[in-house]
């Protein structure tokens, strides 16, 4: 029977990989939107990470599902953001969500 400390140790590399992706996404957003401030928060209820971008006193939200973060590399995530013009969508809409639908990434916004 595995003890709690053993389970935590086995899961550690996956957690570190996700944290690295979070930091890479923050740096990417800072490069794409000059002058913005980015904070992130993990929502365990919805299984996603919300990146809050402060742009000229207005807060915009980019939410990315945990499943999408686990299934794709940071470079693939950046390519998807560029290909789907997520930054333009964020500028016109307040909230954008990237999630998995039927095995493929999808964008929802409002």
Locate each region found by the language model.
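Negatively charged, low-complexity tracts enriched in Asp/Glu with abundant Ser/Thr
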Residues: 2-40, 72-97, 109
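Amphipathic, interaction-prone secondary-structure segments
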Residues: 30-67
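Surface-exposed beta-strand edges and their flanking turn/coil or helix-capping segments
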Residues: 53, 66, 75-79, 95, ...
């Amino acid at each position: 029977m595995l003890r709690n400390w053993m389970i935590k140790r086995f899961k550690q590399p996956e957690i570190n990989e996700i944290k690295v992706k979070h930091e890479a996404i923050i740096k990417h957003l800072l490069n794409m939107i000059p002058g913005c401030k980015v904070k992130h928060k993990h929502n365990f209820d919805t299984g996603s990470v919300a990146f809050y971008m402060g742009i000229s006193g207005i807060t915009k939200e980019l939410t990315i599902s945990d499943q999408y973060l686990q299934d794709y590399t940071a470079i693939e995530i950046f390519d998807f953001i560029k290909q789907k013009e997520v930054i333009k969508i964020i500028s016109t809409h307040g909230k954008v969500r990237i999630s998995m639908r039927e095995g493929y990434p999808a964008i929802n916004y409002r």
